[in-house]
Design a protein with these regions (language model features):
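Conserved mixed alpha/beta catalytic, RNA-binding, or beta-rich assembly cores of soluble enzyme
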Residues: 1-235
Length: 235
């Protein structure tokens, strides 16, 4: 399905006005490589370098229903929230789109994935909060998404209306200020992809020492390292 375009955001007569922008990304990975959080990191880095933007929150890594059969790994989508001037929107959308397409090609994200990006301009509509809850606890049919898109006029989907747009908009709909945890992610370059060199004992000792603050790093009963991913993604 063709993407949606929000024409009034590009009104040149309002170019000096600030606007709130929420960016959602999902399904930017496959069993062979890529990672939605990694692309999000690259986008944040590029926007800070080339555009006059002010992020209003940390990137939100939003976990959705883990039982969905379409998931590639952990079924997590990302929302980025920022303020910028309307005059920057055209370049922002182009940068976001170009970087996503380049990433999909570079990391061969195709088989089993249906990548989606979405932008919400202004306040987050209550319909997206409902979408988040449904995506967390249930299965979201594409018709449900289309009903939302037909109601709202502040959502743009530059890559089309893919399955990934469901997760992207659900991440945007996550209620800001809710209880959360924090993840510290480290990424490797493509030439470093292979077996991860992580010292098992160091993770085990750190997990014991800081058990009051961290979790799911090590399975002490099975003596198994949990902190490292098992796929070819850049994490």
């Amino acid at each position: 399905l063709r993407g949606r375009y929000v024409s009034n955001v590009y009104d040149e007569g309002l170019s000096d006005q600030e606007i709130l922008v929420h960016i959602g990304l999902d399904d930017i990975d496959s069993h062979f490589g890529g990672c939605t959080t990694h692309l999000s990191y690259l986008i944040v880095k590029e926007l800070l370098k080339t555009l006059n933007v002010e992020f209003i929150d940390y990137p939100n890594l939003v976990r959705l229903n883990p039982s969905i059969p379409f998931k590639t790994r952990g079924n997590g989508a990302v929302a980025l929230r920022l303020k910028t001037f309307r005059s920057n929107i055209k370049l922002l959308v182009k940068t976001l789109t170009d970087m996503t397409l380049k990433y999909l090609s570079e990391y061969e994200v195709s088989v089993g994935s249906d990548p989606g990006i979405a932008l919400v301009f202004g306040d987050v509509p209550k319909e997206l909060s409902k979408l988040y809850m449904k995506a967390l606890t249930d299965y979201v049919h594409r018709d449900y998404l289309l009903n939302i898109l037909n109601k709202l006029d502040n959502i743009e989907t530059p890559l089309g209306i893919s399955r990934g747009v469901i997760g992207a908009l659900a991440a945007i709909g996550w209620p800001q200020g809710s209880d959360c945890t924090y993840e510290l992610l480290a990424y490797r370059v493509l030439r470093g992809v292979g077996e991860r060199c992580v010292d098992k004992d160091s993770v085990k000792n750190a997990d014991l020492k800081y058990s009051e603050y961290i979790f799911n790093n090590y399975d002490h009963e099975e003596d198994v390292l949990l902190i490292t991913p098992h796929s070819n993604d850049p994490v």
